Amino acid sequence: MKKLVATAPRVAALVEYEDRAILANEVKIRVRFGAPKHGTEVVDFRAASPFIDEDFNGEWQMFTPRPADAPRGIEFGKFQLGNMVVGDIIECGSDVTDYAVGDSVCGYGPLSETVIINAVNNYKLRKMPQGSSWKNAVCYDPAQFAMSGVRDANVRVGDFVVVVGLGAIGQIAIQLAKRAGASVVIGVDPIAHRCDIARRHGADFCLNPIGTDVGKEIKTLTGKQGADVIIETSGYADALQSALRGLAYGGTISYVAFAKPFAEGFNLGREAHFNNAKIVFSRACSEPNPDYPRWSRKRIEETCWELLMNGYLNCEDLIDPVVTFANSPESYMQYVDQHPEQSIKMGVTF
């Protein structure tokens, strides 16, 4: 059997493995479909993650260096690529009561022919309803971050909303904002194909940031007022600078991206200083949730799964391209790392 592994920075390969015996609380799944994570996973793949030599210390709530003799946060050769899988249970441990052999399920896991997952008190292992879409299922993870971005920005009926970066998270945020009652939804992305999909699913306008004063265009489209909410998913300094320029007085930027380091020139003066801008850093998996105790990550996940399975969210167009597992190393390097403009969220069939 084979699994997709990062053997070196920016190098993916299929590697042989043998399954271990499952424990009493586990199930083994034969994977049929899957998808990688195009955001933070790619930072890891490029060896650009702070987690390689540092760890986020929960007690101090800050990054601290790993001890010199401790394992690195990412070890190439062992680093398995992939985020979500859909497949059929082929083995159940003796303590498993909520699942059975033959069940079709979705869960977090790497791109490999089989995965072993805890199946006792694990709400993240989801049963696939009859006839449900695997493409919607593998968007379970990005949907959570899109939902938290929309909720943390307090999008309300009638708001002018901008979504910057139309990858999977941004595309789902477009759908959620429009369905939440935003009167004008504007997408920002340089890739025409992504903009076309966003328009099909709720965007009233899309802007190409290349050669465009995005902030001024947002003000023009909103009668000089600016956006009540801007959801920033790209992580680029220019995008945040444009968002500060296009934000309405007292508006909110919901910063969803795991940002890249900002080069010299980023300016928190100018419009940011004059327009009482608010920046909220949004992360679905940071607990306690800003709306705790009413909301938690579990509630976000439960809600996202329901919306994905009942068709409220439509992610069929977002899984593009779809490649075979046999071709996944080359496809990962091309579509996820080297030419991300050629994809939104890559799907993998087994």
From Swiss-Prot:
The keyword NAD applies. It is an enzyme of class 1 (oxidoreductase). GO terms for molecular function: oxidoreductase activity, acting on the CH-OH group of donors, NAD or NADP as acceptor; zinc ion binding. Its cofactor is Zn(2+). SUPFAM superfamilies: GroES-like, NAD(P)-binding Rossmann-fold domains. Its EC number is 1.1.1.-. Transmembrane segments: none annotated. It holds the Pfam family ADH_zinc_N. It catalyses: a D-guloside + NAD(+) = a 3-dehydro-D-guloside + NADH + H(+). The keyword Oxidoreductase applies. It comes from the Bacteria. InterPro entries: ADH-like_C (IPR013149), GroES-like_sf (IPR011032), NAD(P)-bd_dom_sf (IPR036291). Keywords: Carbohydrate metabolism, Metal-binding, NAD, Oxidoreductase, Zinc. Binds 1 Zn(2+) ions per subunit. Belongs to the zinc-containing alcohol dehydrogenase family. Catalyzes the NAD(+)-dependent oxidation of the hydroxyl group at C3 of D-gulosides leading to 3-dehydro-D-gulosides. Probably functions in a metabolic pathway that transforms D-gulosides to D-glucosides. Is also able to catalyze the reverse reactions, i.e. the NADH-dependent reduction of the oxo group at C3 of 3-dehydro-D-gulosides leading to D-gulosides. In vitro, can oxidize D-gulose and methyl beta-D-guloside, and reduce methyl alpha-3-dehydro-D-guloside and methyl beta-3-dehydro-D-guloside. However, the actual specific physiological substrates for this metabolic pathway are unknown. This is D-guloside 3-dehydrogenase. It comes from Escherichia coli (strain K12). The gene is ycjQ.
